[in-house]
Amino acid sequence: MSCLLAIDAGNTRTKWAVLQYETGEILQRGVLNDDMPAEWALCERVAVANVAGPNRQALLEARLKLLGLPVRWHASTLHACGVSNGYAIPAQLGVDRWAAMIAAWQHYQRSCLVVNAGTALTVDMIESTAPGQACFLGGIIMPGIRLMQESLASAAANIGAMHGVFRDFPLSTQDAVCSGSLHAGAGAINNLLTLLGERCGEAIPCILSGGDAVALLPLLQKHILHSEFCLEENLVLQGLWYMERGLP
């Protein structure tokens, strides 16, 4: 059985998955630490999406060299797997966003909003243009939920490092900070859902991934009743599989 090692090197964590090459089934997955995962020995090739900069790439290169496997460092392109990249300079689009959009399109084959709620919160719009074809129309990047909270705590003297919970009617500073950051993220998502829905003339599904997606999901489901919300944990890793296969 041929396997692909997919690696998503993000700003906070490096996630990996071993996927069955023919089907894309995830056989093993994890978060990279100091040890070389034993499961990597199952693989015959490696696909990497790195948005963490050259230092992280150098560390990964040193580890992957020990495996002796062919490695492809993916980048965003003008077109891949049925999706056209609307960026003025396609290569400047973060490859994690590109991979997530490709996976979302391949899974759902319809206009959709793709949200990655990590260190940054990215919200990207895909429009179906023809059977099997889509276009990335544009998207936004804003501080992620935790980064918003940490930035406020470091910049405001009377807030400090506090851990609140979401409440409809916050009555403490820590809960107000937590609730405010989640409302900010959910509001941005709602705005782009409305924008894309008006363009496409239909209710738009929202595909969520990233570490803070679980925190955003209940708020979105409660207040945005006309949209379908789908939680996908491994969009970037699955997108790398599609990119590696070069599926149409």
Curated annotation (Swiss-Prot):
Keywords: ATP-binding, Coenzyme A biosynthesis, Cytoplasm, Kinase, Nucleotide-binding, Potassium, Transferase. InterPro entries: ATPase_NBD, Type_III_PanK. The active site is at residue 96. Substrate binds at residues 87, 94-97, 173. The keyword Cytoplasm applies. Transmembrane segments: none annotated. ATP binds at residues 8-15, 119. Its cofactor is NH4(+); K(+). Catalyzes the phosphorylation of pantothenate (Pan), the first step in CoA biosynthesis. Belongs to the type III pantothenate kinase family. Homodimer. This is Type III pantothenate kinase. It comes from Methylobacillus flagellatus (strain ATCC 51484 / DSM 6875 / VKM B-1610 / KT). The gene is coaX.
